[in-house]
UniProtKB/Swiss-Prot annotation:
HAMAP family named in the record: HisB
Organism: Pseudarthrobacter chlorophenolicus (strain ATCC 700700 / DSM 12829 / CIP 107037 / JCM 12360 / KCTC 9906 / NCIMB 13794 / A6) (Arthrobacter chlorophenolicus)
GO biological process: L-histidine biosynthetic process
UniProt keyword list: Amino-acid biosynthesis, Cytoplasm, Histidine biosynthesis, Lyase
Gene3D superfamilies membership: Imidazole glycerol phosphate dehydratase, domain 1
Protein name, per record: Imidazoleglycerol-phosphate dehydratase
GO CC annotations on file: cytoplasm
Top-level EC class as recorded in UniProt: lyase
Lineage per the UniProt record: Bacteria, Bacillati, Actinomycetota, Actinomycetes, Micrococcales
UniProt pathway: Amino-acid biosynthesis; L-histidine biosynthesis; L-histidine from 5-phospho-alpha-D-ribose 1-diphosphate: step 6/9
Family statement drawn from the similarity comment of this UniProt entry: Belongs to the imidazoleglycerol-phosphate dehydratase family.
Amino acid sequence: MTSTGSNAAAARTARMERATSESSVLVEINLDGTGVSDIDTSVPFYDHMLTALCKHSLIDMTVKATGDTHIDVHHTVEDVAITFGEVLRTALGNKAGIRRFGEATVPLDEALANAVVDVSGRPYLVHGGEPAGQEYHLIGGHFTGSLTRHVFEAITLHAGICLHMNVIAGRDPHHIVEAQFKAFARALRAAVEPDPRVEGIPSTKGAL
């Protein structure tokens, strides 16, 4: 695993390569981007979700991943999420001057999801509200609904953030997942955004 990063005010960027016997992953991000993405995970629906994440968070991101998808896409999906979490943590640096908290409620037709993010340094995920059986649906031919929670678990753990994700409504499995990714994107965008009124670390402890 190799990583590089810069958290200077003008360049909150990071890049990481992660290789295991199950997958090979490269993720590069720029937190102060415009939502430009170059995504290829070999899992088309996941590519679609990560592209939406970039678009609505305004994070520029490159993802290149290959893995044992002939067995199951789980390894590749989770390893990409782990690597994204790591580069997010690296790009944030000491978190000085950020808003820290972000919240968004996002619809996609009949589906509605709410996400609340705290860039706290303490990884925690609360994930609920999906309709019964959502985890068993196969979306796009490869992506099972249960992977949604795994993705958010991996991101929160490795980025060191707290995420409360709640599905308020939804019927179509695709829409339910996409609403969650878009809500997370908007909440993350707000949380990592620089706040010109904040001096130093946004915590009474002096560290995050």
